Amino acid sequence: MSSSVGLDTIVSSLVKSSPPGELDGISQDLSAILSSKSNSSTVNTAIEKYINENSGVFSSTYIASKINKHESSTKYIDFIGKKLFNIDLHKQTAIDFEDYEPEVKYPAYFDELVKKLTEYGEDHYPSKYAFTIVPDGSDLQIIIIGQKLNYENFYTGLWKSHYKIKSGSIEGEAKLDIHYYEDGNVRLNFEESTSGTLSSSNASEIVNFINNAENEMTLKIVEDFNELNQKYFKNLRRLLPVTRSKINWGQAIGNYRLGSDVVHNK
């Protein structure tokens, strides 16, 4: 019993630490290591929980999240296309679509908001972009996800922002996660919150707020990264020995004394 609880915790922790765009690889590795049917169920449960909590993009368009999860089934609601869909965790695709009429009231500006968010993504997100809107009368929530997945050059990145509009006010948070793993393993995480008041609840006002907020967040990321690079990384470099030569951490590590000792187990 205790070993089963321990396994659940370990699997959940590994899945939770998954870098952007690499969840399928982690899923395959865990499934290969934990080959029994019960353990496979443990992996799938951990992945479903991760997706519900953090949101995921399927078929490059559809977002699955706890905020658009259908209450009485395993499916998710696409409020824009008015459909239910399931997800294939391993192929990262949306499947098993069916027509659905949500039992919520849509704001009058909903269609215009869809149009403006589409244009916003085309203008500001250079790679994969998806969004979903969850209406509830005059209130609504928006999730925006931008991904840049460059496996050939060993880096993946994800931007996710979540906004809540209620009674003329808007609050949101953005998370940035970048993973670089060529001859090393570097991870950059950034989180920032924002809030404000809308002079009027319409599509233009909402998207303008999102645009301004995300521009400010982007500038803050650049400033924080420059400070990290110029201050902390620079101080770290001063603690390292000056060899006046580039260390090839891959092929030539054995040529250095420390590397030779490691290679030959001295």
Swiss-Prot record:
It is found in: Cytoplasm, Cytoskeleton. GO terms for biological process: actin cytoskeleton organization; barbed-end actin filament capping. Its main location: cytoplasm. One of its GO terms (molecular function) is actin filament binding. The keyword Translocase does not apply. The keyword Magnesium does not apply. Heterodimer of an alpha and a beta subunit. Belongs to the F-actin-capping protein alpha subunit family. F-actin-capping proteins bind in a Ca(2+)-independent manner to the fast growing ends of actin filaments (barbed end) thereby blocking the exchange of subunits at these ends. Unlike other capping proteins (such as gelsolin and severin), these proteins do not sever actin filaments. This is F-actin-capping protein subunit alpha. It comes from Debaryomyces hansenii (strain ATCC 36239 / CBS 767 / BCRC 21394 / JCM 1990 / NBRC 0083 / IGC 2968) (Yeast). The gene is CAP1.
